[in-house]
Each structure stands twice: as C-alpha cells, then as structure tokens.
C-alpha cells in the first residue's frame, strides 16, 4: 500500500456485517472515500478516518455539510455527517486526490456536523 495522504480518494473494501448491511441512511464501505485524518495519523496508525462518497440523487443533495467533489471528472457528494474509522487493510486502491478547495469544504462540513466551530 502506498503513502496515504489527507485528501486522497481510496476505494474502501466492503466489510462483512453479521446479519446484513447498512440500516436506514447509513453509508458503509464498498465505495470510494476521502481520507480526512491528518498525515501524521495516516503514517503512524493502522486506522484512518474517512468520509465516504456517494452519487448525487434526490435524497442526498449538496449542501454545506455534504459538499460536491469531483473524482476523475465525476461529481460525487462527500457525506461529512458520517465520518468513519477504517482499518488501512480495507484501502484497496488509490483513485485520486481532491482539490485543496474541496478538502477545505469537506473539513468545514465535518466541523459543522460535529459542531466544532
């Protein structure tokens, strides 16, 4: 596995969940995610923090908490109100890296979702 950096977009391998998959509006693995943990944690820890990406649709629209990002020219929504911890072994392939302004929008969305302002 290569160097994992904040702002990278990685595919996160699906985790088997006993009794089924997600419940309600949960987002889970088996999809791309943006690494949001800082680079020091990314180098030293076996776990990283991610924000999963999803396709825009009627239920999930872009807003201050869930900004739009572009990965390989495709529009996705960063689901910032569902930050997840992921073991590095689940990161299967690096897809891209978000633009600086997109990472800033994600960080702002997390701060709003967690009331860190």
Regions found by a protein language model. Give the residues of each.
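Conserved functional hotspots at enzyme active or ligand-binding sites that engage polyanionic ligands
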Residues: 1-117
């Amino acid at each position: 596995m290569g160097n994992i950096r904040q702002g990278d977009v990685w595919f996160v391998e699906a985790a088997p969940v006993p009794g089924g998959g997600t419940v309600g509006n949960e987002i889970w693995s088996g999809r791309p995610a943006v690494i949001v943990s800082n680079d020091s944690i990314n180098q030293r820890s076996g776990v990283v923090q991610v924000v999963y990406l999803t396709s825009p649709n009627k239920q999930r629209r872009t807003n201050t908490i869930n900004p739009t990002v572009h990965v390989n020219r495709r529009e996705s929504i960063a689901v910032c109100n569902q930050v997840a911890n992921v073991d590095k072994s689940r990161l299967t392939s690096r897809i891209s890296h978000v633009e600086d302004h997109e990472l800033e929008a994600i960080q702002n969305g997390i701060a709003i979702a967690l009331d860190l302002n």
